[in-house]
Amino acid sequence: MKKITKFKDQKILVLGLARSGMAAALVLNELGAIVTVNDGKPFEENKEAQVLLEEGIKVITGSHPIDLLDEDFALMVKNPGIRYDNPMVERAEALKIPVITEVELAYLVSEAPIIGITGTNGKTTTTTLIADILNADGQSAKLSGNIGFPASEVAQKAQATDTLVMELSSFQLMGIDTFRPKIALITNLFSAHLDYHGSQEAYEAAKWRIQENMTADDFLILNFNQEKCRKLADKTKATVLAFSTKEKVSGAYVNEGKIYFKDEFIMEASELSLPGDHNLENALAAIVASKLRGAENEAIVEVLTSFAGVKHRLQYLGEIDGRKVYNDSKATNILATQKALSGFDNSKLWLLAGGLDRGNGFEDLEKDLEDLKGMVVFGQTADKLRLMAEKLNIPVFASQNVATALKEIMPQTQVGDTILLSPACASWDQYKTFEERGDLFIEAFESLK
């Protein structure tokens, strides 16, 4: 932790709670700031607000009163989920009150070097791989950011000898100022969060902010499989290293089935524990970041050959009577399911899919389902998916939910088959979150083992 005095006796407003807002409030309070927290959830339903009140922090809940900003705040720390067109944020900016997100605060309170990972897909897996490799190497890596561990809380506790491995969303990056990671990594850039950002250009601009304070002493890792990312290499002051599955590049790459870092052989690509081309990209990205932090090949190979996946993200659960089972509940859109399917032999694969109907069709998925052994469909999109399967002459069965889907499909499968839950849909028609959906699938798996 840095010895920060700039927050002492400063009036700071934390707008929006949840885990990151609560962490920011507690960190600022410990640093001597005069903290006010404002959250829209009523106090009696607001566990975070109740905890903060017990800590002596001023809490205003149930609404966002504009006149609160008349109190002459020196800074606003905004929950990343709150949009910039929120009246409170607009008023703060009109009053020239700096508005930051909690990751900027994390940078300010820690001397530990930061590896920042952003992108559209693969962030959580890549972030976890990097941390696991560094820890296997005997270093001290701390997971933080958009991965469930509030960045400011982790940063405040970190030592200068630690490495903060930080997953960063576009929402978080919009609220940085001086934030400067030692290593930044962009996994890929696809269409996402247009409801928040308004356009693809604005979304990508938010992601690109990860490198805006970097210099030639810092490293930016880019995915050269994607032309969009390749073109960014000339637009940064940072030193660029690339990863690619298609060509030899400055960082990690695949050549004739072998993985290299620069000219150094690391391992056979076939040894990776996670299936799919996208996970090969994730592994290459993690190798570059880990090598830049001095990790030995032994640690890299140890992790990449044994990593079971992040929970709900193409997570290998095990076998039931010779059938392999994977939980990819995080696949809440067609693109994510396409990436999951790329790692399997369709002729032995049973796909479990369905969920919230957002009004879209599934035509883009058809080519990825060729020769699929069978499907089980559920949720609001069950009929759409069933019709598509019938059109492609794929055996298809309907079920009530993910748990019944697994139980009911088992008699149809054979030894050597693979069962994959990759819904291609959001979970909100039947479940509160994709995590709840995945947990119920795991429970069903455990009951059948």
Swiss-Prot record:
A GO BP annotation: cell wall organization
SUPFAM superfamilies named among the record's database cross-references: MurCD N-terminal domain, MurD-like peptide ligases, catalytic domain, MurD-like peptide ligases, peptide-binding domain
GO molecular function, one term: ATP binding
Keywords on record: ATP-binding, Cell cycle, Cell division, Cell shape, Cell wall biogenesis/degradation, Cytoplasm, Ligase, Nucleotide-binding, Peptidoglycan synthesis
Main location: cytoplasm
Source organism, top-level taxon: Bacteria
Cellular component GO terms held in the UniProt record: cytoplasm
EC number: 6.3.2.9
Residues bound to ATP: G119, T120, N121, G122, K123, T124, T125
Protein's name in the database: UDP-N-acetylmuramoylalanine--D-glutamate ligase
Origin species: Lactococcus lactis subsp. cremoris (strain MG1363)
